[in-house]
Amino acid sequence: MACRVMEVLLRVLAILLSIAGALVMAKDKQDTFVMLGTVPVPLYARHSYVEAFVFLVYANGIVAIYCFIAVLLSLLAKSRVLAGLLFFMDQALAYLLLAAAAASTEVAYIAKRGEKKLVWGEVCSNFEHFCNLVGVSLVLTFLSVLVLVTLAILSGKRLFGHPPLCAPPSTPPVHQGV
């Protein structure tokens, strides 16, 4: 029972982290002006301008929906087939979210530092607020990845562990006096 509660709490935590990561990124935008001589030129930053950030929003949304469904399934049904499916899906979605976070981290790094070999300048000096919120979203997303990895480890131990994790404690045999 304690393991089921821990699993549900971890899945709820993954839901909250993924929703927060998606919302922070999806709402992230900034408008600014730079001066070219005496002419102000408007600049705009939106998450939708960068495909990696869009991927991050969708991946976080998929993880949140999956974890919600997994909570319902784990509360309603208990079978080895379901445990195997959750083990597989926890890993698959951890990899999906890790891929989205890694791609977005690379874009954020280039935005912050630029890429000298390609003569790409950094842009975060013009969009500091935008870049800071990208960082917040990435932290939330990587935390969600860690929760999913923890769930995959717990699922694997439950399926393949000897003795199985969360197995009911065995009671010693009662000796009757002769």
Curated annotation (Swiss-Prot):
Membrane-spanning parts: 5-25, 53-73, 81-101, 133-153
Gene Ontology CC entries for this record: plasma membrane
Entry membrane topology: Multi-pass membrane protein
InterPro entries: CASP/CASPL, CASP_dom, CASPL
Cytoplasmic compartment residues: 1-4, 74-80, 154-178
Keywords: Cell membrane, Membrane, Transmembrane, Transmembrane helix
Extracellular topological domain: 26-52, 102-132
Organism superkingdom: Eukaryota
Coiled-coil residues: none
Cellular location(s): Cell membrane
NCBIfam families: A_tha_TIGR01569
Family listed: Belongs to the Casparian strip membrane proteins (CASP) family.
UniProt subunit comment: Homodimer and heterodimers.
PANTHER family: CASP-LIKE PROTEIN 1U1
Protein name per its UniProtKB record: CASP-like protein 2U3
Organism, scientific name: Pteridium aquilinum subsp. aquilinum
Lineage: Eukaryota, Viridiplantae, Streptophyta, Embryophyta, Tracheophyta
